[in-house]
């Protein structure tokens, strides 16, 4: 490094220079290490060169390898589309360049003292003796170099190259002009400009006091009022004007950057049109592209007089290109150099050039009628005929003489008025860009990329006019709907498919790996009304036993197999009584339970999507995906007691799920469930409703097999496991009607619009074939979201939304119970108990407060009256009889009649007498448990340990009931619910606690603790889980193989124990964005899921459509990763 170095550099001002061309330099005060100061002058280009040298020499410090390591300051960028040598640009750059200099000299010595920096700031001869500029007056006619500042106008021989002045002609602006492009200048009338270049296109490059740019020649006039250098003309026949003679004594040449005007006569020149032109007035000539025309007269205003097809008239010069065969002749005629400016950067070079010969006189600043003459060699000036009214017509002999090459050519200005030429003063010629266009090859048209559409993931459609497909299949898009559904053709099939499952690629690139990275998280809303007929409700076929595989709502295969309204034949075999007995085992789809698939599924990290997060937060009401352990518990129960309702539902779920069968896991789960139940009972009163909501989600994802059975979507031969099934099968009309309504709701849902199955209507009398179940109707029929997996009877959504069927709903409870045992299964709004179910022992309760029904499925009653509880739902909705009326009522409005034993309470009300004893005991304990749960829920609500979920009235999806907003998840409408603790029935010892459950909270009233499935509500206490375990055993023993036969919960909507199921890569919903979420409630994990406290931040790495997200928990000493229920998360602000 140099000891003598720059200590400081300050840019103080800018200064204009005109040598070699107009530009600005920055005045820099440089202080050196020896305390000496110098003033140097540098133009921007020198700064730019220095910067490039530094970046090349110090790539690391320049940030080329790592931008974060850059220490070399940034230099103001180049001006690409504007003149960088105008004052306003120079002034704007002043401060940034000053900062650049200051920063530069403060860099580490190996940079600030390098040779490049030293040479840049070192004083040069021009810095010591800066050129003196004489700017003259604004009226000057030319700008001289410093050596000729006061040189008078005189004849110059041109012998001395260094002594010759360069003249820039001055013109006066005759009219205001507003620039249209950056390269142009705006003009004010009366302003004087220096003409640097005159282009045949009619656009001249001029310089004002501060800037330079292109302007239309028609707006300029020579200072003496003439149109100088526009045309060649003579004043009289065979006679040269006096002005012309005067100029013969001078150089017949005038400097312009465009070149010199060569006043030679030549034949008419042939030009080829480069683009079509349509005449806009009678004195113009139109032509097509590529035709040859003869140019009779040229001028620098951009309009040439041409002959085409025997007609003569004016045409824009920019549309003409010299014919190739005419170029040689033209070259021979050139007496001087013709300079064509191909680049603005050549201007300075031209200014430095010397005139090679002074054989021609400069164009005369002709009479008022003259027009400027072309800079390039001007062709033979064909004069207008007298017939045209030209005052300056030249007789034929003059024309012939000129044609022979007469040395003296008078200039004639085309009297536009006389020859009816365009009024160029008000009409600028075509843009200069157009005129230059023919000189440059036209950019090629962008290559058209042919694209094709293909599917990016597997999708199973359950709507009549939908289409199922695998990932990677080629699809032809026939119609696109703004709702997010496209009508596509895949192979020989056509139908509606979610646009989020379709991507496009270049046709040639067939090998492109299908990816879901950019695929929207969830299928969009249903297609347009186009498939309306399909919307009329998935019927029969879709709802057939095959339907279980196909959810009514369209879900991607990976989202969780939907067991939609399937009722397992085995389950169907189970008598309604069994179902009533609470043994209602969720029909177990033949398909592996979603839980198992979920467990297998492992979504890719980074598959997060905020939208899904938001939806999922509300979708899963409880920790539903809660502990797989609980699920396992239930699963175990199911595996061990597959016959038992709980076990059957679980077994379905678990059976399909890899771990479901593991007794050990189930027991562990039970214990965990128990433990969690207690903890969460205190903690999350809302869990219940949450569980129900989870249930909904599960249903959407493909409810657990039990739920599917409960939906009894399967063929009618299967006996309804749930009341809904029963109803469908023809169980007591009341119950059947309810189920039918629920099913009808399911059926009615337009197929075109996949949505969460509506809550089953509670109309018991109406039984509807499962085929007619429609998602939308089901959804409408869904009971309060808070219900427990309540017997899985309803699909998740159903469960969550339907009032939980309490013990009274034995049949659906059977499945529900299995679900209760499996707590995982959400309870759908209990369909009205079938008569068999509710004919069982009814418990008398007293109303503690008046209640006004909100939906038709509910019942109103005054305070202090006795009502008979026919069916109980864990969600807190009980089916009661008051006088001749029956309907759903919130359990917290009822208190046990002192004289009444809760024997049949809980599920047992519905249970068959055969199971009555066990059920009775269970119901008794359940009753107590329910009361305890209610109390806990109330406490939790007050504590707001988990976000409370507004309950929904049993009969439908009415807003009044507080049903959570319906959201689309994987093409299925789902009830958005916040996590709420769903309590598994605590051990009987806790029964003394009685508290009204919130409407959407699920009671753990079911017989025993049900194993919690992943989408089921689990806020069940672990103790409850243990109890459930015991109950499962009892149930298994008492019910024996009957439990498997128990139909799924009434009106059950498929509920899937939604554990993250393995998903093909192609099915992953990827999103590269990493989002940070915050937990909104405590969650106690299991061996498969991660537990966390409320308020914990976590980064979403993967999002599984079933509602389980793979996250990295950020809070804590050591971050860890695991699956967490998405409904326990909310976006971090």
From Swiss-Prot:
Residues 4-128 form the PX domain. Adapter protein involved in invadopodia and podosome formation, extracellular matrix degradation and invasiveness of some cancer cells. Binds matrix metalloproteinases (ADAMs), NADPH oxidases (NOXs) and phosphoinositides. Acts as an organizer protein that allows NOX1- or NOX3-dependent reactive oxygen species (ROS) generation and ROS localization. In association with ADAM12, mediates the neurotoxic effect of amyloid-beta peptide. GO terms for cellular component: anchoring junction; cell projection; cytoplasm; cytosol; podosome. It is found in: Cytoplasm; Cell projection, Podosome. InterPro entries: NADPH_Oxidase/PX-Domain, PX_dom, PX_dom_sf, SH3-like_dom_sf, SH3_domain, SH3PXD2_PX, SH3PXD2A_SH3_1, SH3PXD2A_SH3_2. Its main location: cytoplasm. PROSITE patterns: PX, SH3. Residues 166-225, 266-325, 448-507, 840-899, 1072-1133 form the SH3 domain. The gene is SH3PXD2A. Pfam families: PX (PF00787), SH3_1 (PF00018), SH3_2 (PF07653). This is SH3 and PX domain-containing protein 2A. It comes from Homo sapiens (Human). Tyrosine phosphorylated by SRC. Phosphorylation plays a regulatory role in the protein localization. The intramolecular interaction of the PX domain with the third SH3 domain maintains the protein in the cytoplasm and phosphorylation disrupts this interaction, resulting in the redistribution of the protein from cytoplasm to the perimembrane region. Phosphorylated on serine upon DNA damage, probably by ATM or ATR. Residues 567-576, 608-620 have a biased composition (Acidic residues).
């Amino acid at each position: 490094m140099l000891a003598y170095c720059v200590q400081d550099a300050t840019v103080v001002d800018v200064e204009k220079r005109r040598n070699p061309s107009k530009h600005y330099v920055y005045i820099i005060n440089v202080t050196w290490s020896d305390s000496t100061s110098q003033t140097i002058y540098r133009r921007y280009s020198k700064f730019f060169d220095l910067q490039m040298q530094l970046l090349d020499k110090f790539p690391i410090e320049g940030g080329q390898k790592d931008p974060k390591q850059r220490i070399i300051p940034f230099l103001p960028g180049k001006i690409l589309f504007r003149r960088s040598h105008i004052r306003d640009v120079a002034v704007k750059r002043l401060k940034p360049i000053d900062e650049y200099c200051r920063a530069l000299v403060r860099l580490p010595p190996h940079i600030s003292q390098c040779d490049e920096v030293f040479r840049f700031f070192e004083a040069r001869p021009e810095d010591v003796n800066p050129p003196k500029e004489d700017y003259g007056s604004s009226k000057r006619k030319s700008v001289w170099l410093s050596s000729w500042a006061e040189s008078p106008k005189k004849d110059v021989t041109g012998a001395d190259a260094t002594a010759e002045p360069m003249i820039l002609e001055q013109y006066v602006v005759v009219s205001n002009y507003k620039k249209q492009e950056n390269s142009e200048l705006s003009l004010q009338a009366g302003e004087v400009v220096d003409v640097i270049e005159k282009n045949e296109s009619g656009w001249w490059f001029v310089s004002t006091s501060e800037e330079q740019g292109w302007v239309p020649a028609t707006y300029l006039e020579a200072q003496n009022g003439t149109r100088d250098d526009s045309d060649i003309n003579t004043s009289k026949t065979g006679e040269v004007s006096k002005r012309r003679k005067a100029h013969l004594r001078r150089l017949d040449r005038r400097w312009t950057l465009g070149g010199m005007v060569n006043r030679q006569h030549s034949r008419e020149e042939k030009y080829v049109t480069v683009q079509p032109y349509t005449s806009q007035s009678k004195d113009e000539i139109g032509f097509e592209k590529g035709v040859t025309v003869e140019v009779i007269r040229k001028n620098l205003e951009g309009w040439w007089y041409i002959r085409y097809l025997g007609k003569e008239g004016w045409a824009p010069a920019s549309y003409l290109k010299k014919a190739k065969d005419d170029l040689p002749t033209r070259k021979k005629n050139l007496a001087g150099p013709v300079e064509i400016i191909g680049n603005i950067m050549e201007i300075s070079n031209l200014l430095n050039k010397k005139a090679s010969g002074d054989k021609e006189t400069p164009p005369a600043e002709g009479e008022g009628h003259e027009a400027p003459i072309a800079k390039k060699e001007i062709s033979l000036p064909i004069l207008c005929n007298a017939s045209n009214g030209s005052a300056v017509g030249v007789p034929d002999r003059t024309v012939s003489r000129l044609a022979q090459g007469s040395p003296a050519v008078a200039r004639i200005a085309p009297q536009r008025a006389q020859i009816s030429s365009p009024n160029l003063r008000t009409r600028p010629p075509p843009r200069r860009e157009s005129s230059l266009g023919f000189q440059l090859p036209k950019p090629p048209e962008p290559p058209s990329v042919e694209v094709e559409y293909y599917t990016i993931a597997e999708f199973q459609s359950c709507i009549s006019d939908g289409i199922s497909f695998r990932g990677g299949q080629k699809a032809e898009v026939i119609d696109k709907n703004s709702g997010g559904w496209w009508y596509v053709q895949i192979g020989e099939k056509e139908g509606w498919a979610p646009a989020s499952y379709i991507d496009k690629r270049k046709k040639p690139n067939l090998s492109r790996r299908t990816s879901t990275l950019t695929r929207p998280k969830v299928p969009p809303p249903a297609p347009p009304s186009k498939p309306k007929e399909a919307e009329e409700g998935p019927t029969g076929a879709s709802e057939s036993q095959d339907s279980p595989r196909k959810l009514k709502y369209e879900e991607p295969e990976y989202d969780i197999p939907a067991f939609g309204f399937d009722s397992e034949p085995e389950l169907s075999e189970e008598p309604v009584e069994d179902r009533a007995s609470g043994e209602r085992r969720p029909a177990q789809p033949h398909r592996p339970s979603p839980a198992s698939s979920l467990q297998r599924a492992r979504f890719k990290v980074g598959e997060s999507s905020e939208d899904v997060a938001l939806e999922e937060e509300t979708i899963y009401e409880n920790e539903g995906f809660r502990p797989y352990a609980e699920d396992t518990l239930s699963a175990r129960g199911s595996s061990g007691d597959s016959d038992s309702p709980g076990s059957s539902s679980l077994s379905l779920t678990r059976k399909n799920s890899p771990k479901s069968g593991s007794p050990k896991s189930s027991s562990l789960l039970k214990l965990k469930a128990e433990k969690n139940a207690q903890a969460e009972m205190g903690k999350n009163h809302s869990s219940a409703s949450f569980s129900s909501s989870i249930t909904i989600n599960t249903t959407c994802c493909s409810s657990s097999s039990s739920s599917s059975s409960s939906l009894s979507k399967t063929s009618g031969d299967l006996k309804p496991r749930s009341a809904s099934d029963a109803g469908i099968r023809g169980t007591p009309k009341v119950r059947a009607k309810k189920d039918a309504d629920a099913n009808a709701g399911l059926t009615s849902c337009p197929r075109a619009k996949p949505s969460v199955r509506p809550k089953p209507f509670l109309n018991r009398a109406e039984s509807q074939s499962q085929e007619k179940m429609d998602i939308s109707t089901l959804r409408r029929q869904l009971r309060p979201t808070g219900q427990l997996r309540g017997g899985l009877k309803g699909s998740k959504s159903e469960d969550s939304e339907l009032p939980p069927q309490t013990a009274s709903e034995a049949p659906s409870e059977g499945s529900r119970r299995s679900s209760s045992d499996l707590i995982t299964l959400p309870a759908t709004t209990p369909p009205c108990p079938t008569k068999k179910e509710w004919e069982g022992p009814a418990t008398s309760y007293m109303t503690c407060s008046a209640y006004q029904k909100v939906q038709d499925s509910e019942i109103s009653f005054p305070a202090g009256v006795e009502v008979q509880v026919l069916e109980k739902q864990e969600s807190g909705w009980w089916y009661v009889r008051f006088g001749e009326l029956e309907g759903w009522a919130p359990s917290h409005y009822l208190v046990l009649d002192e004289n009444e034993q809760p024997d049949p309470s809980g599920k047992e009300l519905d249970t068959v007498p055969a199971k009555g004893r066990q059920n009775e005991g269970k119901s008794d304990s359940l009753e107590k448990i329910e009361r305890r749960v209610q109390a806990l829920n109330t406490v939790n609500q007050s504590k707001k340990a988990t976000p409370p979920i507004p309950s929904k009235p049993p009969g439908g999806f009415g807003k009044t009931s507080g049903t959570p907003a319906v959201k689309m998840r994987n093409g299925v409408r789902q009830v958005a619910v916040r996590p709420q603790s769903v309590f598994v029935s605590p051990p009987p010892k806790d029964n003394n606690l009685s508290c009204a459950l919130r409407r959407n909270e699920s009671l753990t009233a079911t017989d025993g603790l049900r194993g919690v499935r992943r989408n089921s509500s689990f806020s069940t206490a672990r103790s409850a889980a243990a109890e459930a375990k015991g109950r499962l055993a009892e149930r298994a023993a008492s019910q024996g193989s009957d439990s498997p036969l128990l139909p799924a919960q009434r009106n059950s909507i498929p509920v899937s124990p939604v554990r993250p199921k393995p998903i093909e890569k192609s099915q992953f919903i990827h999103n590269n964005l990493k989002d940070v979420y915050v937990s909104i409630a405590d969650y106690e994990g299991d061996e498969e899921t991660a537990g966390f406290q409320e308020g914990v931040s976590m980064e979403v790495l993967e999002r599984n459509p079933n509602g389980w997200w793979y996250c990295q928990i950020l809070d804590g000493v050591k971050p860890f990763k695991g699956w967490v229920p998405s409904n326990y998360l909310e976006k971090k602000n």
